[in-house]
């Protein structure tokens, strides 16, 4: 890790994700040659959220590139929780379906946690079932949520030292921030590779002065709150690695067009950081790539379990 720099090295998540997808395509060919059936991922969208449609479309493109069979099931926003649960139960029982993801968010009348927990643990490629979250927390074998797993892969690819380093995770979502903190502090005694960082979690109730203080002490900052420009230049230690998970759609006043930005003031922070991820093109592509990783992993486990039973 560099601790002094005139300008941060931009972490090209798009290029790294392409490497991962290429590796996975090669791995899948090996699996099929060994007699494994083709993995099949089913995505479920409830309602007509344009962002959800785009995210799922990107996942389907990645499936085709890797060689994974896939389909998208679209349900109207009026779908009841019971109807969605029945669909998930049917997919759980279908041996041809090896991966299931329910694109979040779901309509307000549907309980997100209930839906995540309804997905079979072994087919839960998002890693959102409470069993997978619990296994991740205990450093056990699990389907780890794709975004924090993608961040971990980025850090490893860039050879960012984590052993004994101070890491700050800004945000406390159960699907991203919590498993991210868990991965950063993992000691490697069980299934999860050690990262051995000293981890601090900050959130909306962390006073701004305290947030700034914690960030200034951090060698690694991972921010995922959905607040444009939250992390500023004065909050970052020179040479720190800044990972921006935020995705915010804002209007560019100079052009009148909408654009995507993260939670980090990118142009300012890159002047002091050692490494930084852009938005778009940073964490997002890695999330999709690691979802493909989880899908292959899930398919292999299910086939192996059937052979041994």
UniProtKB/Swiss-Prot annotation:
The cofactors required by this protein are:
Mg(2+)
Highest taxon, organism lineage? Eukaryota
Swiss-Prot/TrEMBL catalytic activity: (6R)-5,10-methylene-5,6,7,8-tetrahydrofolate + NAD(+) = (6R)-5,10-methenyltetrahydrofolate + NADH; (6R)-5,10-methenyltetrahydrofolate + H2O = (6R)-10-formyltetrahydrofolate + H(+)
List the keywords (alphabetical): Hydrolase, Magnesium, Mitochondrion, Multifunctional enzyme, NAD, One-carbon metabolism, Oxidoreductase, Transit peptide
Q: What is its EC number?
A: 1.5.1.15, 3.5.4.9
Q: Which GO terms describe its cellular component?
A: mitochondrion
Q: Which Gene3D superfamilies match?
A: Leucine Dehydrogenase, chain A, domain 1 (3.40.50.10860), NAD(P)-binding Rossmann-like Domain (3.40.50.720)
Keyword Transit peptide listed? The answer is: yes
User: What are its GO biological-process terms?
Assistant: tetrahydrofolate interconversion; tetrahydrofolate metabolic process
Q: Name one GO molecular function term.
A: methenyltetrahydrofolate cyclohydrolase activity
CDD domains according to UniProt: NAD_bind_m-THF_DH_Cyclohyd
The subcellular location is: Mitochondrion
Give the InterPro entries listed for this entry: Aminoacid_DH-like_N_sf, NAD(P)-bd_dom_sf, THF_DH/CycHdrlase, THF_DH/CycHdrlase_cat_dom, THF_DH/CycHdrlase_CS, THF_DH/CycHdrlase_NAD-bd_dom
Q: Which HAMAP family match?
A: THF_DHG_CYH (MF_01576)
Further details from the record:
This NAD-dependent bifunctional enzyme has very different kinetic properties than the larger NADP-dependent trifunctional enzyme and is unique in that it requires formation of an enzyme-magnesium complex to allow binding of NAD.
Q: How does it assemble?
A: Homodimer.
What family name appears in the similarity comment? Belongs to the tetrahydrofolate dehydrogenase/cyclohydrolase family.
Query: What does this gene product do?
Result: May play a role in spermatogenesis.
Q: What is this protein called?
A: Bifunctional methylenetetrahydrofolate dehydrogenase/cyclohydrolase, mitochondrial
Q: Which gene encodes it?
A: Nmdmc
